[in-house]
From Swiss-Prot:
Organism the protein comes from: Leptothrix cholodnii (strain ATCC 51168 / LMG 8142 / SP-6)
Free-text cofactor note: Binds 1 [4Fe-4S] cluster. The cluster is coordinated with 3 cysteines and an exchangeable S-adenosyl-L-methionine.
Protein task: Catalyzes the conversion of dethiobiotin (DTB) to biotin by the insertion of a sulfur atom into dethiobiotin via a radical-based mechanism.
Taxonomy of the source species: Bacteria, Pseudomonadati, Pseudomonadota, Betaproteobacteria, Burkholderiales
SMART domains, per database record: BATS, Elp3
Enzyme superclass (EC): transferase
GO-annotated biological processes: biotin biosynthetic process
Designated gene of the protein: bioB
EC number annotated for this UniProt entry: 2.8.1.6
Residue ranges of every copy of the Radical SAM core domain listed in the record: 59-286
UniProt protein name: Biotin synthase
Catalytic activity: (4R,5S)-dethiobiotin + (sulfur carrier)-SH + 2 reduced [2Fe-2S]-[ferredoxin] + 2 S-adenosyl-L-methionine = (sulfur carrier)-H + biotin + 2 5'-deoxyadenosine + 2 L-methionine + 2 oxidized [2Fe-2S]-[ferredoxin]
């Protein structure tokens, strides 16, 4: 039997159950994840929707807002990133944003319905002189009643503990791709560097936000390899952002061929099935997706988005457009009370 013709019942019998995944010895094999990808599209979405409904309200979406608190000039050579100092892009380097400007953005995000505020700095890793300011940002944003998330590059154990002591709820550090594709995109930071940072974050008691990027030229097997890596983290991340590559002029991936839209939906569904209780977040690339494709992603188990007009340096759908889509799909925003409808009759 080939993976292309494997039945749903056979796959369910062979792959680790949710209960078995609680055992650290139980792991997703890349072949099993690839077999999920190979299911008929409707079968895959049906299974993903079943898993989703078992753990979440299928008609609820969580909103996160992402702010670049330090843009450009990064020493890393990530081939997808316009903030890298290695590439000639339109991004201008900036210094770390003043705390009052961060708080203005956080208040605006909260007013628009975001429940989590993510702050990103284009660093290889934060310097000690910056830690006092970023920890103060965490404390001040948290005081507004928002969940806090940061992505600052690599962290050592002490830095992770400082962020935890400040009250940081989530730390984002993506794996980006499968190990066997990673070297084609990045040379200045190893895969193990990323895993070490995730370990430091876990050890400090901070929730992990970790995902990857599809559409960089990887194969389906390599997409399955990324999902397997994420699902086999012990435990798997509380949040998994799935990014659809936004090709940026001046970067090595500027001319990358776009991924098939149904393959992107399959990636969302496979992430949901392999990581049943995680928040699967639609991240970069939504501006290039039509509403029908986004609706399929929600049906496949996505239950979070980055909300707001900009993601670091790339565009994002306007908040009003997202709200209109939620209304048409009957999706409720997490943390908001349903609107009370009145009638003139």
């Amino acid at each position: 039997m080939t993976t292309a013709t494997i039945s749903l019942s056979t796959l369910q019998a062979s792959r680790p159950s949710v209960a078995a995944r609680a055992d650290a010895a139980a792991r997703w094999r890349v072949a099993d994840v690839e077999a999920l990808y190979a299911l008929p599209f409707m079968d895959l979405l049906f299974q993903a929707q079943q898993v989703h409904r078992a753990h979440f309200d299928a008609n609820e979406v969580q909103l996160s807002t992402l702010l670049s608190i330090k843009t450009g000039g990064c020493a890393e050579d990530c081939g997808y990133c316009p903030q890298s100092a290695h590439f000639d892009t339109a991004v201008e380097a900036s210094k770390l944003m003043p705390i009052d400007e961060v708080l203005d953005a956080a208040n605006a995000a909260k007013a628009q319905g975001a429940t989590r505020f993510c702050m990103g700095a284009a660093w290889r890793s934060p310097k000690e002189r910056d830690m006092e300011r970023v920890t103060e940002m965490v404390r001040e944003v948290r005081a507004l009643g928002l969940e806090t998330c940061m992505t600052l590059g690599m962290l050592d154990g002490e830095q992770a503990r400082e962020l935890k002591d400040a009250g940081l709820d989530y730390y984002n550090h993506n794996l980006d791709s499968a190990p066997d594709f990673y070297g084609q995109v990045i040379s200045t930071r190893t895969y193990q560097d990323r895993l070490d940072t995730l370990g430091n974050v876990r050890d400090a008691g901070i929730n992990v936000c970790c995902g990857g990027i599809v559409g960089m030229g990887e194969s389906r097997t390599q997409r399955a390899g990324l999902i397997a890596q994420l699902a086999n983290l012990s435990p798997y991340p509380e949040s998994v952002p799935i990014n659809n590559l936004v090709p940026v002029p001046g970067t090595p991936l500027a001319d990358a061929e776009p991924i098939d839209p149904f393959e992107f939906v399959r990636t969302i569904a496979v992430a949901r099935i392999t990581m049943p209780t995680t928040m699967v977040r639609l991240s970069a690339g939504r501006e290039q997706m039509d509403e029908a494709l986004q609706a399929l992603c929600f049906a496949a188990g996505a239950n979070s988005i980055f909300y707001g007009d900009k993601l670091l340096t790339t565009s994002n759908p306007q908040a009003a457009r997202d709200r209109a889509l939620f209304e048409r799909l009957g999706l409720r925003v997490q943390g908001e009370r349903p609107a009370v409808r009145t009638s003139d009759n």
